[in-house]
Each structure stands twice: as C-alpha cells, then as structure tokens.
C-alpha cells in the first residue's frame, strides 16, 4: 500500500500586517485526515512572541519592540492519513508594524499671554502622523484650536489674573496601510497673565513739601514693579523699584513743574501694560 502525499496546506489568518501587541491566529487546513506541524522564524526586525515549534492552529501575540516593520515566517507542513506521510511545507510571512510614539523630550511650554504656543511632534516611527485635541483650564484662556493635526501653533490669551493652562492631547498614528495607533501624550502650555497695577492718584504739592509714598498693588500674585521719573529735578531719582518713597518736592523755577512717573509691572517674566 502506498499512501498518498497530502496536498499543500492552506491557512486562514487574522489580518496581515498586524500592529505590535495584537494576536495572530492562523488555522491550517487541507485534505481530510491531514495533520499540521509548524515552525516559526523571525526573519526581520525585533519581534518577540512567536512560538518556535507547534502543531495545529497558531495563536501568537507578536510584539515589535523596534522602530521599523518586522516579519515572522511560519512554515506549515501537512501529514496525511494514518501513516502520516509528510507533505509539502508552505511558508506564511506575517508583517508586524511597530507602535509609534511621541518622542519629543519636552512636553511643556510656558508663555506670556498673547504669545505663540508652538509644538512640532516627532516619533520613533518614520511617517507617523499626529492628531490632537485641546482644552483650557478656564474660560479666561482663549485662542486654542479645539482639534487639529500635525504642528501646533496657537496664539493664546489669558484675560484673567491667575496662571492658566492649555492641555493638548496628542495621538500618534503609524503609516498606512495598518495605521497603528500609539499612546496619547499631553503637551501642556502654561499661559501667564499680563500683570496690572492699581491706579495711582496724582499729587499736587508746594515747593519744599513732603510727598506721600506710593505703594503699588497688582491683582496678579507675585508681581514686581519698576518705575521711571521723567523729571528728576523735582527731588526724586530717575528710576526705582517697588514703591516710590516719600521725598521733598523741589521747584526752583518760577512756573509749575509736572513730573510723570511711569510704572511697569512684571510677573512670571511677563510685562504688564
């Protein structure tokens, strides 16, 4: 009796290519009574999770820890009948795409109100694309785009007195045809307000009179103040910081002198009006 050689096996499988971390299911079939054995070999890339030797169906979870596409070759051999005559071996090559990431080292930015929030996302996987959504910490921060793709470039305004933030949630997606989706990351922009200074009343004095000291107040926490005096001959220096001290007003002319003191508030490296 000469047993026949089984026909070449065929296999129905899950989608190919697959994304890293996904399950691969391969079901071999052939003529009635045939059994199947197989081996697997990583033929390119940094692929783990493939079972080296097995029989019957293939159920592996394949992981690509690299940044480029990898492949695993499954070699399936059929044996037929009670005597198990070996048949031909058929190779099935599975492609495993890596999961892209957002590889930027810095995911925060601090700006002053009215300035540009700028971020160019990069990835470990070539030809990755990026989509994002944005939310503000309160209604006082405006100017951000609610959803977009690619580079972020919004001019952000903080109309309040407290520090506000805008959080961009960026999602990387690998190239077609598999379009593997990576883990979203947050890019957080801190938007400092422009500090203000309280209104200061003008003073009218006689020559030789003492002025009232001027103390500045801002609604923005941590504000500092500098000032300049355009007429130092009145007895006050040309510039100073924080408050304006009391001084003796001087006018050695025959006409009134008007001096203008200009106050410049700053907070968190942002200048106010």
Give short role names for the model-derived ranges:
Residues 1-273:
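Extracellular low-complexity Ser/Thr/Asn/Gly-rich intrinsically disordered segments
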């Amino acid at each position: 009796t000469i047993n026949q050689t089984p026909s070449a096996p065929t296999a129905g499988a899950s989608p190919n290519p697959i994304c890293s971390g996904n399950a691969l299911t391969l079901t071999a079939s052939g003529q009635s009574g045939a059994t199947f054995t197989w081996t697997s070999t990583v033929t390119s890339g940094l692929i783990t999770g493939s079972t080296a030797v097995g029989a019957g169906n293939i159920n592996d979870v394949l992981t690509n820890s690299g940044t480029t596409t990898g492949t695993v070759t499954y070699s399936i051999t059929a044996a037929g009948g009670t005597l198990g005559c070996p048949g031909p071996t058929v190779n099935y090559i599975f492609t495993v795409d890596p999961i892209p990431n957002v590889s930027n080292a810095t995911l925060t930015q601090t700006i002053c109100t009215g300035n540009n929030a700028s971020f160019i996302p990069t990835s470990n996987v070539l030809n990755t694309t990026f989509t994002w959504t944005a939310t503000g910490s309160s209604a006082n921060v405006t100017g951000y785009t609610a959803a977009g793709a690619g580079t972020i470039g919004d001019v952000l305004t903080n109309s309040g007195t407290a520090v506000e933030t805008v959080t961009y949630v960026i999602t990387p997606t690998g190239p077609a045809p598999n379009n593997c989706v990576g883990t979203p990351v947050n890019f957080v922009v801190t938007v400092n307000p422009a500090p203000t200074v309280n209104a200061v009343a003008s003073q009218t004095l006689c020559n030789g009179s003492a002025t009232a000291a001027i103390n500045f107040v801002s609604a923005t926490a941590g504000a500092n103040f500098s000032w300049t005096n355009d007429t130092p001959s009145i007895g006050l220096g040309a510039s100073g910081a924080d408050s304006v001290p009391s001084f003796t007003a001087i006018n050695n002319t025959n006409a009134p002198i008007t001096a203008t003191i200009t106050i410049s508030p700053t907070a968190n490296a942002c200048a106010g009006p």
